[in-house]
Amino acid sequence: MARPQLLSIPERLDANPRFTGRGVVIALVDSGFYPHPDLMRPKRRIKAYADATRDEAVADDFFTPRAASWHGTMTACTAAGNGYVSGGRYRGLASEAEVVLVKAMSSEGKITGKNVAHAIRLPLRYPHLGIRVLNVSLAAPSSDPDLPEVEAAVAEVVAAGITVFAAAGNTPGRPSRPPASAPEAITVGGLDDKGEREGDASLWPSSYGTIREGLDKPDLVAPAIWVPAPMLPGTLVAREAVALFQLLSVLEELSVEQGFSEQKQRASHDERSSVNGLIDAVSARINRQKYIGVDYQHVDGTSFAAPIAASVAAQMLEANPSLTPAQIREGLLATAAPMPQYPKIQQGAGFIRPRQAVMWAQQKKQDKFVAAVEEGALE
């Protein structure tokens, strides 16, 4: 059986490899995190870790792989992982950016509007961290009384010069809820590019709709399926992946006649059928669990589309550090590619194009330079 392989996000989106988010700090708000090697090696790029549900962060929660840590670890590595464990293969678009990780789910597994708003405001409390981009891939329940506070937090952070991205959600036909419903957030819906660079793309079934008069979400779409992401080391899922691939390797050896002849035996038809049946069963389990190796799975949902868009913003800021949140929004939407077979309300401006967005940022920088020369500010 051929081992599962996926193209990396930079390959699929035809990103310019010169831009990797160097010098840019991205904050990620999520359920929990773990310092994965894709963020820690060969150089530590986790600038800070915070827990918005407590007065002080608990180191044990961070350094021990926990059930609640997988989602945030995957979103962080989707944006800024360097693919260290995969030899650089499964890297994100902002593979040299620094990250600030902000936990917003309590130890009881609850996500509240109060905690999400507190997490979003972290850059305002710690301006020395230099956060330029913030991604939120979670939301409080629709019944939470503090949802207006979440939208207010987004507005405050964007006003301070930080570009906020939010996952649209995965409920087709239903509008996004805060923070994705905030006018100032760049809300990211889902794209199914079939895991290919030039696949027959379609929309991923994500939330969309009119938030209020004059405000539709999402703003654009990005890959939300076939996204490679690392598993938490030492967890049951990770151990199963190792065991399955080891077992598959042994079974494949047994399935060829040479494997039996080494023991001066000849495989009977029944023996062969039995081994091949096991191969089919193990392969089916690997596919069902979405394993693409002993360290990575492919994941889906707008939770992963949003950090991909955030990583494009980091590339744009690397190309032109003077960009404002309004300009980043303008550039992303201006360079997105509409999908004419779908209504605008489902896709916003269309699917994200990193190379074109970075070129837009570079052109803005050039235009500013030319204007300064013409005005005599530069000689």
Positions of predicted regions on the chain:
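Extracellular S/T/G-rich loop segment that most often corresponds to the catalytic His/Ser-adjacent loop
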Residues: 30, 47-54, 182-310
